[in-house]
């Protein structure tokens, strides 16, 4: 035992030395994680693609890193396992030094089939130093020795091993890998491990390769379990048992980082879904997780699951000191791990299986101690598993009895956990768990039914933090954990996570959990007893007492940030929580974990400060509700340097569950490396973040990168490296990129794009980035940027472009105060602050904590609500002040349909108010494994649990303000961000006038996909629902898949409030029930068409009796209008849209006629901004009239429904008002068959008929239109269509009865008929002088017919050409007293257009000013945002309208120059509520000026400066070509680029 332990310590010391000497190479978290993944993934890399696919469902592929690694490592595992197994004594006969303790005993699992896949992942070794050491020793000494240690039957006893391995491995893999890298670096001498690493992790540095063979084996083993390869499992199991404990200990300690946990949370779902995805992406773990999340997209399960785990969370303020609370067992919701439903054949473990249960129980035991570490390990696979676990999971992992020696050692997990898993041999019963659910100890309720059915039901998985009772968590983590052998503990912790996860919601519902039974064989196997190990480590354990306080301090600071999540947790617990992922893990795992923790990158035993890169305080966003989830990730990696032989004393952590208050400190203390340099720590973080951001904004909880490097015995110190790392690294990378010529990657070494992995072909050519030298496809390398070494613009990839842009923006932001912060950033990122003893303040001093680019962990956590501000990317606040650089944050967008994470290829930087929601996402390059960039992602708006809950989301409640808006009362299907008490939109401080305010679209793109249509394809599903009160500071929330029943309940609620649907990121539709003219109508109104230059649309559709579903065809109509507007095809007054297929469940519905409301009643309608049109449903037989003579149809509708001039309502199933075309004068004037020609209509030309005279008023400005009519008509007939006259009190209406067209008059209600309008006039020059008439005038249908002689026709033509008035006298030649007169008058018609339109510059009315639409030849786009100039208004000053033709070209030039000047600022303008901008240009002989504003307020000066430099040259160049004076106003909209 002694020699064993010493050897382990010695190895650990060496590893630590290596880490300290080569921190860069070892990027702790990433490298380790990558290595771990690589070991387990590399082996599976080849198998992964095939096996993963076959073994796991698509969703599971997400489970990926675990699953894929599991699959692929199947082959490698078998070999590795054989070797390692040989080194390991049979579980039955011996206890490994690393002792599987609980984990080992768990290995009693009957088979990998029995054990759930998730469990497999979770079972990965946690980094048990001792275990690892043992493995190393065996590996290094000889395979034969190992073989000797293991009985023959050990191999056959794969089940037991499997159980252990699965639980420990799965958990450890992702997180552990990070820790393992450092810890097991040396241990991993086995060729197999190196192979695995090499395969899987190209990007991972040597650290990954160094991962203990045992770790890789155990990791692989987990994979094998998933693979269903019993043989492999058996072999691995033995190996794992031995290795796992040690590996697990280390891994668990490191992996326990919040980051890892976060990853697991978000990953679980994603992982389950895409096991395959992980295979290549150890480095890209984040991406994988994100992808998984995407696939799971809709499954909020991860997040939801996490909350339950929170319930389960170990936070037990009471047990804090004495008991190890399962670190964030809430995290373990991920562990809920799937007990992959028993259904899953090979992968799902039989929950009932004693062996499996044993594993889980052991895992639980271990986790109780090792929870932090094991959790950290779990994050990659275990947590993922937990997230993945579907509440559906039929198979529940029933912890088997693990009452064996190991169990005794196991520390009792919180009572809650105990309820579910009773260490000390008591069976876990689900009923107990249910009871304890209240205590927060409830594990994720849902287990994944089957590995194949990896999708987690978001609703099912959702666990509410509220349900957690802080007090209940008091259940003590069994102190006996110390008793558990360190190795066993780590393994157990992993297993525990998995097993805890195994408790499915179903189990919670009351199914009894099987006892976690530890295999006797497994117990007998260990070389060193738990008691011996505990005794040996006791002194060291005592040394970690300071760690607790340190962690508490950290937790306090973090807790402020996460108080929202903490809602259900006790404040005391929060304080008690240890954030040391490593130290925490270590404490739980005892000596082993400590050792692992020691491995932490900067762990300096000498100082007694183990600078655990992992000491990061992970704020697990998995579930905002999962308070315990906040894994006490701050690792108390500061295990006393006093530890003997370099081993860190194990320390019990009473980890009160608490909301993850800080970002995942996934990143190592090492400053972020330049994009070309792989940063394992960074990679790990990205994995967690990606998953988090993808599946849950909450996951993207990492608001602060706080590395609490170590909390040494003497005191605790915070390492701030990670916090600034994002902005700082970005800045550094941006500064470095382009300074010198990069190394050119040869074409031969890049068969695929190094960003999107697309294969290069003859047509898809290679492009080298001039900034980084890598090879990309044309899509990924389509940017241009000025590089210093070239002194000119050159082609760069999208990643370098973003990095350089961010660096430039960051520098611009640096003010006198900002620059100081900047310098502090770098210092804090790389240095460990001196330990501060007895630091009890819950708010760490600024010097102690890293200055987060996202937020300051201390004060802002408390005052997040008051501190929320909006600022521009370049650091300017809306009021012109300089923004504090420490608050720089960004927003993330998520797809409403696929919940996909940000594309690794498309960096998004968005200013957001909510620091606590940001997550750091790094993009590892699939080919090189290098992290090409760091990204801070924040999603201020997410979905809210339920409409009823909406109001509460804005309060200081533990529930995230933004989570998926589940109309369901109780469920927060997906809480994306456990954010500050009030998740505020970026533009929250901008007053939103109403649901029709165009500014409401400013942030929609952050919550939905950039798809042109978000309408589901099926008939029943509805588009995403946006719920917003329209009040200042209100928090919009999005429900991805609302149901008709829920919508009806909302619509029929009090006051008939409208609901808003998101048809795409640029178009909203408000729906409401209204009573109009005593009937009930569906009222639809759009918001967003103005951005394309299209008038908004309203539709009033009569409700059918007992109609309880929204007519979705209306949404399709709006999408059609939107697409037409994109093409420049606009709908205006009296235009139409027709259908060729059934519409609104009837083939008789022909389309819509659109009119501009005039005399109609609009008082009770929530109208959109002007201009807008009203759509009226028409029948198929009415289509000809809508096309050739729409005014006739409009007026006929008015006569039918007693409305003047027309109704605004649409009635389904009505009889058509016109039948087959009969004998009508229109047959002579228009083509009613093929629509080849129609009646020439002159806008604003009016025909007024009174007694004895008729007047045809022709606007002078329409002279050109009149000339067109004359030139196109024959010499005998002139026909002109008129406009509807608002000056007339009645109008002629044509009615068809039995094929005969008759004339009626329809008048406005309550007005006497004096002036009657007509729809057209026909001058017929065929009247013969011999007829005895001078001229004849008569009413024909709804128009005026004037018959004149040829001579009179010639005079009329001449008068029209010369723009002179003309009078026609009608009547008989001899009847002087009975004559009538027809006057043709040229009038200066008053401009009545643009009614209700106001200027964005200063708010003045634009009514009466002529305008015309502008169509630019090209769009100006940046960051997927387009600036569109839609219209120009002319402020004429006694000028002839003829100048408009020349002014239009000048206006286009101004529009292009302005668009180019605004382009760099589109994102900041839009995010700050300025998505509609007006530009007014005034030019005179001695004066040139312009004004730019939005919503009546001038733009900030720095925007005007850019406009000045762009516009002045254009204005001066255009003055000579335009008539002066000239004053115009251009309207610009900033919209999203949709696909």
Swiss-Prot record:
Zn(2+) 1 binds at residues 753, 756, 777, 780. Zn(2+) 2 binds at residues 769, 772, 797, 800. One of its GO terms (cellular component) is cytosol. It is a peripheral membrane protein. The keyword Cell membrane does not apply. Widely expressed. Highly expressed in kidney, placenta and lung. Expressed at intermediate level in heart, brain, skeletal muscle, spleen and liver. Weakly expressed in colon, thymus and peripheral blood lymphocytes. It is found in: Cytoplasm; Early endosome membrane. Changing residue 753 to S: Abolishes localization to endosomes and association with PI3P. PROSITE patterns: ZF_FYVE. Residues 469-491, 640-678, 816-850, 884-907 are annotated as: Disordered. May be involved in regulating membrane trafficking in the endosomal pathway. Overexpression induces endosome aggregation. Required to target TOM1 to endosomes. Interacts (via C-terminus) with TOM1 (via C-terminus); interaction is required to target TOM1 to endosomes. Does not interact with TOM1L1 or TOM1L2. This is Zinc finger FYVE domain-containing protein 16.
């Amino acid at each position: 035992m002694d020699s064993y332990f010493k050897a382990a310590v010695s190895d650990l010391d060496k590893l630590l030395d290596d880490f300290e000497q080569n921190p860069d190479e070892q990027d702790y978290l990433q490298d380790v994680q990558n290595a771990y993944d690589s070991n387990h993934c590399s082996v599976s890399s080849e198998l992964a693609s095939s096996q993963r696919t076959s073994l796991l469902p698509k969703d599971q592929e997400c489970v990926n890193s675990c699953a894929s690694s599991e699959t692929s490592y199947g082959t490698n595992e078998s070999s590795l396992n054989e070797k390692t197994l040989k080194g390991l004594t049979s579980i039955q006969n011996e206890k490994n030094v690393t002792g599987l303790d609980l984990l080992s005993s768990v290995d009693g699992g009957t088979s990998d089939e029995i054990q759930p896949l998730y469990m497999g992942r979770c079972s990965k070794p946690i980094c048990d130093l001792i275990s690892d050491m043992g493995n190393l020793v065996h590996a290094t000494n000889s395979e034969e020795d190992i073989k000797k240690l293991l009985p023959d039957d050990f191999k056959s006893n794969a089940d037991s091993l499997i159980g252990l391995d699965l639980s420990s491995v799965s958990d450890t893999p992702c997180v552990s890998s990070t820790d393992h890298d450092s810890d097991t670096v040396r241990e991993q001498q086995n060729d197999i491990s190196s192979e695995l690493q090499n395969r899987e992790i190209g990007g991972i540095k040597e650290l990954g390769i160094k991962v203990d063979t045992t770790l890789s084996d155990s990791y692989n083993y987990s994979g094998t379990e998933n693979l269903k390869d019993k043989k492999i499992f058996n072999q691995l199991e033995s190996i794992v048992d031995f290795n796992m404990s040690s590996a697990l200990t280390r891994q668990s300690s490191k992996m326990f980082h919040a980051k890892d946990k976060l990853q697991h949370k978000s990953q679980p779902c994603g992982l389950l879904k895409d096991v395959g995805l992980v295979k290549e992406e150890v480095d890209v773990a984040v991406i994988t997780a994100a992808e998984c999340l995407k696939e799971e997209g809709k499954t909020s399960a991860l997040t939801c699951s996490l909350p339950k785990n929170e319930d389960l969370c170990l936070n037990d303020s009471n047990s804090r000191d004495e008991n190890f609370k399962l670190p964030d067992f809430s995290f373990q919701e991920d562990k809920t791990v799937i007990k992959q439903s028993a259904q899953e054949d090979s992968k799902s473990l039989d929950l009932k299986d004693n062996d499996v249960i044993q594993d889980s129980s052991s895992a639980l035991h271990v986790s109780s101690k090792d929870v932090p570490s094991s959790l950290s390990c779990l994050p990659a696979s275990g947590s993922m598993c937990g997230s993945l676990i579907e509440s559906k999971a039929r198979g529940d992992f029933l912890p088997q009895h693990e009452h064996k020696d190991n169990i005794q050692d196991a520390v009792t997990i919180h009572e809650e956990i105990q309820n579910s898993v009773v260490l000390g041999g008591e069976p876990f019963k689900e009923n107990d768990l249910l009871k304890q659910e209240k205590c927060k100890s409830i594990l994720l309720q849902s287990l994944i039914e089957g590995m194949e059915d990896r999708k987690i039901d978001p609703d099912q998985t959702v666990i509410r933090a509220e349900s957690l009772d802080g007090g209940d968590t008091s259940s003590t983590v069994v102190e006996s954990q110390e008793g558990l052998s360190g190795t066993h503990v780590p393994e157990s912790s992993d297993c525990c996570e998995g097993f805890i996860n195994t408790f499915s919601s179903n189990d919670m519902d009351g199914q009894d959990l099987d006892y976690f039974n530890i295999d006797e064989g497994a117990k007998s196997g260990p070389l060193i007893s738990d008691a011996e190990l505990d005794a040996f480590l006791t002194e060291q354990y005592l040394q970690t007492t300071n760690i607790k306080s340190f962690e508490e301090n950290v937790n306090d600071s973090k807790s402020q940030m996460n108080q929202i999540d903490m809602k259900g947790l006790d404040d005391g617990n929060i304080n008690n929580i240890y954030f040391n992922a490593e130290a925490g893990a270590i404490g739980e795992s005892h000596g082993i974990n400590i050792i692992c923790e020691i491995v932490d990158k900067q762990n300096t035993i000498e100082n007694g400060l183990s600078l655990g890169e992992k000491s990061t305080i992970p704020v697990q966003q998995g579930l905002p509700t999962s308070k315990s989830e906040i894994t006490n990730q701050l690792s108390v990696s500061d295990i006393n340097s006093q530890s003997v032989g370099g081993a860190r004393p194990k320390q019990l952590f009473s980890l009160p569950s608490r909301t993850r208050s800080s970002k995942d400190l996934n990143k190592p203390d090492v400053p972020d490396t330049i994009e070309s340099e792989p940063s394992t720590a960074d990679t790990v973080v990205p994995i967690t973040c990606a998953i988090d951001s993808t599946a849950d904004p909450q996951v993207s909880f990492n608001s602060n990168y706080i590395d609490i490097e170590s909390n040494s015995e003497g005191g605790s110190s915070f390492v701030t490296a990670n916090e600034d790392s994002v902005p700082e690294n970005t800045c550094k990378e941006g500064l470095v990129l382009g300074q010198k010529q990069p190394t050119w990657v040869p074409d031969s070494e890049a068969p695929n794009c190094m960003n999107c992995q697309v294969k290069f072909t003859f047509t898809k050519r290679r492009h080298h980035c001039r900034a980084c030298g890598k090879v990309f496809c044309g899509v990924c390398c389509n940017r241009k940027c000025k590089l210093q070494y070239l002194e000119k613009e050159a082609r760069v990839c999208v990643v370098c472009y973003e990095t350089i842009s961010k660096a430039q923006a960051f520098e611009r932001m640096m003010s006198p105060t900002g620059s100081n912060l900047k310098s502090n950033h770098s210092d804090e990122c790389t240095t460990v602050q001196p330990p501060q003893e007895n630091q009890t303040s819950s708010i760490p001093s600024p010097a102690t904590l890293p200055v987060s680019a996202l937020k300051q962990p201390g004060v802002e956590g408390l005052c997040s609500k008051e501190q929320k501000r909006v600022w521009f990317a370049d650091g300017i606040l809306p009021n012109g002040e300089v923004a504090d650089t420490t608050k720089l944050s960004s927003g993330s967008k998520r797809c409403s349909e696929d919940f996909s994470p940000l594309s690794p290829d498309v960096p998004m930087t968005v200013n957001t108010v909510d620091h606590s929601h940001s997550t750091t996402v790094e993009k590892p390059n699939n080919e090189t494994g290098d992290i090409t960039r760091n990204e801070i992602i924040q999603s201020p708006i997410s979905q809210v649990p339920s409409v009823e809950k909406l109001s509460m989301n804005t309060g200081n409640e533990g529930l995230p303000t933004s989570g998926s808006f589940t109309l369901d009362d109780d469920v927060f299907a997906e809480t994306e961000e456990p954010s500050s008490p009030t998740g505020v939109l970026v533009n929250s401080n901008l007053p939103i006038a109403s649901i029709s305010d165009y500014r409401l679209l400013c942030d929609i793109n952050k919550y939905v996909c950039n798809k042109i249509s978000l309408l589901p394809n099926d008939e029943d599903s509805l588009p995403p629902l946006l719920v917003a009160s329209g009040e200042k500071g209100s928090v919009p929330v999005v429900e991805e898949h609302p149901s008709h029943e829920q919508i009806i309940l909302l619509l029929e609620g009090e006051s008939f409030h409208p609901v808003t649907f998101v048809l795409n990121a640029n178009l909203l539709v408000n729906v409401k029930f209204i009573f109009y003219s005593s009937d009930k109508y569906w009222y639809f109104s759009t918001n967003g068409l103005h951005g394309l230059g299209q008038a908004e649309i309203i539709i009033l559709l009569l409700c059918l009796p007992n109609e309880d579903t929204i007519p979705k065809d209306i949404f399709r109509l709006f999408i059609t209008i939107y697409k037409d507007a994109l093409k420049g095809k606009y709908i205006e007054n009296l235009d139409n849209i027709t259908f060729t297929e059934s519409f609104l469940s009837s083939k008789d519905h022909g389309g819509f006629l659109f009119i501009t409301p005039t005399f109609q009643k609009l008082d009770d309608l929530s109208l959109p901004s002007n201009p807008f049109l009203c759509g009226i449903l028409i029948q198929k037989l009415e289509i000809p009239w809508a096309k050739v003579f729409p005014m006739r149809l409009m007026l006929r509708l008015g006569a039918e429904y007693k409305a003047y001039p027309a109704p605004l309502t649409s009635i389904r199933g009505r009889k058509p008002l016109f039948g087959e075309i009969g004998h009508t004068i229109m047959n002579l004037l228009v083509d009613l068959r093929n629509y080849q020609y129609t009646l020439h209509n002159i806008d604003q030309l009016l025909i007024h008929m009174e007694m004895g005279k008729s007047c045809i008023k022709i606007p002078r400005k329409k002279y050109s239109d009149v000339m067109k009519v004359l030139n196109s008509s024959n010499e005998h007939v002139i026909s002109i269509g008129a406009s509807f006259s608002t000056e007339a009190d009645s109008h002629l209406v044509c009615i068809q009865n039995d094929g005969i067209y008759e004339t009626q008059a329809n008048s406005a209600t309550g007005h006497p008929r004096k002036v009657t309008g007509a729809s057209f006039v026909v001058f017929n020059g065929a009247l013969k002088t011999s007829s005895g008439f001078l001229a004849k005038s008569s009413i024909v249908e709804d128009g005026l017919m004037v018959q004149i002689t040829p001579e009179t026709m010639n005079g009329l033509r001449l008068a029209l050409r010369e723009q002179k008035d003309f009078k026609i006298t009608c009547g008989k030649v001899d009847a002087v007293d009975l004559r009538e007169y027809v006057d043709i008058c040229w009038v200066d018609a008053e401009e009545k257009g643009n009614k209700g339109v106001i200027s964005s510059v200063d708010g003045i009315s634009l009514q009466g000013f002529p305008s015309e639409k502008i169509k630019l030849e090209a769009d100006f786009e940046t960051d997927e945002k387009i600036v569109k100039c839609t219209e120009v208004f002319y402020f004429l000053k006694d000028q002839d309208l003829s100048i408009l033709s020349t002014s239009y070209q000048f206006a286009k030039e101004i529009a292009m120059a302005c668009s180019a000047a605004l382009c760099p600022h589109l994102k900041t303008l839009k995010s700050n509520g300025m998505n509609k901008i007006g530009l007014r240009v005034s030019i005179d002989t001695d004066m040139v000026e312009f004004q730019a504003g939005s919503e009546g307020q001038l733009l900030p000066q720095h925007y005007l400066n850019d406009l000045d430099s762009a516009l002045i040259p254009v204005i001066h160049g255009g003055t000579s070509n335009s008539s002066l004076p000239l004053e115009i106003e251009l309207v610009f909209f900033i919209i999203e680029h949709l696909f």
